[in-house]
Amino acid sequence: MMNKGGRLRKAVRKSIPATFRLFLAFNFFVYGLAKVVIGQFGEVTPEIEAAAGKGFTIAWTFFGYSHVYELFIGFGEILAAVLLLIPRTAALGAVIFMPIIVNIVLINYCFDIGVQDLSTILMVMCLILLWMDRRKFMGIFRQEPIDSRQVMKR
């Protein structure tokens, strides 16, 4: 019979990744839809072209210049969100999510976008998910085969 501490650890070990996956998926789905459906960055106006000096204005104008880039990032966020919601594909979703969120964190800090806290939290959550699934990725770095039963456990 499992003691209370063992049950609690097991529950936490399962609930934290699930909670992180849902939180990341929700945030990326919302931001992805904002880019794909309404255009998060906006269009370049004469006023914005004349403005200089504000990092946020310059960055948003730059990203808004290319609708293709906005759609690419938006669809990437939506794909990562959907994959994070499905337990069998959650690790792949985290892998897709990671370069996107690292880029977002750098942009937020370098251009003072103002949502540094949220983007940093999302990145740390993704890192934790990747760390918890590290056994799934070990085969990439090893020569010997990995037992699939151990990888798919969880």
Swiss-Prot record:
It is a multi-pass membrane protein. GO terms for cellular component: plasma membrane. The chain crosses the membrane at residues 20-42, 62-84, 91-109, 113-132. It comes from the Bacteria. Keywords: Cell membrane, Membrane, Transmembrane, Transmembrane helix. It is found in: Cell membrane. This is Uncharacterized protein YwoB.
